[in-house]
Regions:
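Flexible loop/turn segments at secondary-structure boundaries
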Residues: 66, 74-75, 95-97, 120-122, ...
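Phosphate/diphosphate-binding loops
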Residues: 46, 94, 101-102, 106-110, ...
Length: 332
């Protein structure tokens, strides 16, 4: 949150930045604190104490591996081991891909230092009381890979659960359940399992196009959707389709996807969203726009349904969202 303020402070003292990313601000502070610290880990801790917001850091030195997680636990971070080597990574799926074993999560507010001499050392100076912790629920809904576990909760299982809740709370008659890839797929499978409506693939995804909702301009978001997704006509033609997506932020990409399904021959398109309506922007680093740009701002679900051109629209309730997180304290 306070990255702009910290950047100005550094520039005032002569710092010259090469990028606009927040990570460079953190790197500068770690470098400066190192001049007055007895160790690299102390410099990391002292730098992190100046930060307000969400972060998960990994810092390396010739003999040490240091990881730091913000006091609220917004962003995930975990430790793995392969043979005699340690790994610190944001998601457990990275450990699987290199044949490493999961050791444990880095706790909210923890700074861990790993060295050959002392193994894993923990500093909990920045830790907050448990009731103040707040995981970013968007990690489970959208950001994280489904084959990851965050703080002991399976991302895949949580998305399956969200889909089942949607089927129970927002049922509709249809011939096919499909997900908007990738993050909508598991929720769509969960909806299918709970409703008995067949699950199928309706979209082919271009894996070379990045995430669309974080594109800076509306025109680039819309063009990215068309390049990123193509509809399998044979899968949807003549069918009533339930389309599961992880969220609706501005609504323009949802409108485009609904039209693509109709153009491919779907007779009905029912949209189900595996998260509650977005009513507020995120102040902790996720590129969610000003409140006035959110489609759910000052609109009913029926009005949103009309805007995106769907036959019906249903969202996951906030209480269901908490159930999906299996009791973890979350930021919503």
């Amino acid at each position: 949150i306070n990255a702009p303020q910290l950047r100005k402070e550094l520039e005032y003292t002569g710092a010259i930045f090469q990028t606009t990313i927040d990570s460079e601000v953190i790197a500068y502070y770690i470098a400066r604190e190192r001049l007055n610290s007895q160790s690299a880990e102390e410099a990391v801790r002292r730098a992190c104490q100046r930060l307000k917001g969400a972060y998960a850091l990994v810092v390396t030195s010739p003999r040490k591996l240091i990881g730091a997680r913000d006091p609220y636990g917004f962003k995930p971070l975990c430790i793995g081991k392969r043979d005699n080597s340690y790994i610190i990574t944001s998601e457990t799926c990275a450990l699987d891909t290199i044949g490493a074993t999961f050791v444990r999560d880095v706790l909210p507010g923890e700074v861990v230092t790993i060295s050959p001499e002392k193994g894993i050392e923990s500093d909990m100076t920045m830790a907050l009381p448990k009731e103040k912790e707040a995981r970013c629920i968007f990690e489970y809904i959208y950001f994280a890979r489904p084959d990851s576990h965050i703080d002991g909760v399976s991302v895949y299982a949580s998305r399956i659960k969200a889909g089942k809740f949607l089927a129970q709370d927002s049922p509709v008659e249809a011939d096919l359940v499909t997900g908007v890839p990738e993050s909508g797929n598991a929720a769509a499978l969960g909806y299918s399992l709970a409703s008995g409506i067949p699950y199928g693939t309706a979209f082919v995804k271009n894996s070379y196009v990045g995430r669309t909702f974080i594109k800076p301009k509306q025109s680039s978001r819309e063009s990215s959707v068309q390049v990123k997704l193509n509809v399998l006509r044979e899968a949807v033609a003549g069918k009533r389709v339930i389309m599961i997506d992880d969220s609706i932020v501005r609504g323009t990409t949802s409108d485009r996807i609904v039209r693509m399904l109709r153009d491919a021959g779907a007779t009905e398109v029912h949209v189900r969203i595996s998260s509650p309506p977005f009513l507020w922007p995120c102040y902790f680093g996720t590129d969610i726009p000003a409140r006035e740009q959110l489609i759910a701002y000052n609109r009913t679900i029926e009005e949103i349904c009309q805007i995106i051109g769907a036959d019906s629209l249903g969202y996951l309730g906030i209480d269901r969202l908490k159930e999906m997180a299996e009791g973890l304290p979350i930021c919503t």
